[in-house]
Amino acid sequence: MILLKLEIRFIKFMNTIQTNTKDKFLLYKSIFISDVHLGTRGCQAKKLLEFYKHTRSENLFLVGDIIDIWELKKSFYWPQEHNDVIQKTLRKARHGTKVQYIIGNHDEMFRKMIPLNFGDIKMVNRLVYETVDKKRYLVVHGDAWDGVMKYAKWLSKIGSVAYNWLLSINVVINFIRQRLGKDNWSLAMFLKNKVKNAVKYIGEYEKTIANFAKKKNFDGIICGHIHKAANQDLDGINYLNCGDWVESCTALVEHLDGRMEIIEWDKLREQVVSYEPYLKVVNK
């Protein structure tokens, strides 16, 4: 009876899993991630490596602020997990995944070097992406549409310091929560959702960048920058924000049928990683 239940669960699970030799992967047409901030203590590199392990795609788009050069210039921090993310990304590119890196503001020094290839990875300022159902999306990091970045870059760097301070506090909070058996919680995200000025800033950013896409006759826009994942319609434009791998650990994916979705790895991993022991038994 127990074995039968396991088999039923396995069959249901396989509806969303692609078989490839002895491994099982979540398979997508394209994956978009942004704001990883390698080189900072807030970066969730271990979770990103786990996400890499369980996903495969034809395309992988790195939508800016993957390497945080701002922070590395101030204080060098580069643990093994951060190096592993770079190596795994390069490995994906070598093994057939088309990987493209859209430059952001924390890695803006790369803009001076364009055209630039990093191994098999092409680095660009922006690009146009066409989905399976022929919809055209402008893909950018998004800092060019941030009023603070555009008119007061020094203020944005002060904000970056304050943000890192919040992340440091969050490490302590989540250590305690894990001890109590509770899920991770983001102080910075909580404040973004509650503080009136932060909510207004995010709303203005979203409208500004969506309006640009509309003027250029795109069906939608894919971006990052503000660390707030979203999939919404703004005046006829599909606004898609990848989120980040500091607080929310989210990614934007295009399914094989052309459907666009924001996935939260902390939630999805419970469905994937929990099956690993059984998958190993089945594959023997």
Give the location of each predicted region.
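Beta-strand-turn-beta hairpins that frame and shape the catalytic cleft
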Residues: 24-30, 129-138, 233-238
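Active-site-proximal loop/helix segment associated with metal-binding centers of metalloenzymes
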Residues: 142-205
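Core catalytic region of metal-dependent phosphoesterases/phosphodiesterases
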Residues: 23-29, 40-131
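N-terminal amphipathic/basic-hydrophobic helices that include classical n-h-c signal peptides
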Residues: 1-13
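Conserved beta-sheet core of the metallophosphoesterase superfamily
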Residues: 119-125, 143, 148-157, 199, ...
